[in-house]
Amino acid sequence: MALLITSKCTNCDMCLPECPNEAISIGDEIYVIDPILCTECVGHYDTPTCQKVCPITNCIKPDPEHQETEEQLWERFVMIHHSDKL
């Protein structure tokens, strides 16, 4: 499933440059994650880098409205980064 940045976000800028899919952007009040681009770092890292670098506990968590299997996240990774080879 895609990740979600909660209202605990302090706009510290730690997560933005870490996303390998460029799924994080500046929202109206806090950073937001585009669920179409978020793969939870599947295909890149073992754990989501945004969660690793975020200084606020439980600020970035699974988005219950975008539940996906690891297989679906892998498919998205391939489409984002390797669609030219399909």
Swiss-Prot record:
Its cofactor is [4Fe-4S] cluster. GO terms for molecular function: 4 iron, 4 sulfur cluster binding; metal ion binding. Pfam families: Fer4. [4Fe-4S] cluster 2 binds at residues 19, 38, 41, 50. Residues 1-29, 31-65 form the 4Fe-4S ferredoxin-type domain. Keywords: 4Fe-4S, Electron transport, Iron, Iron-sulfur, Metal-binding, Repeat, Transport. Coiled coil: none annotated. Binds 2 [4Fe-4S] cluster. [4Fe-4S] cluster 1 binds at residues 9, 12, 15, 54. It comes from the Bacteria. InterPro entries: 4Fe4S_Fe-S-bd, 4Fe4S_Fe_S_CS, YfhL-like. The keyword Disulfide bond does not apply. The keyword Repeat applies. This is Uncharacterized ferredoxin-like protein HI_0527. It comes from Haemophilus influenzae (strain ATCC 51907 / DSM 11121 / KW20 / Rd).
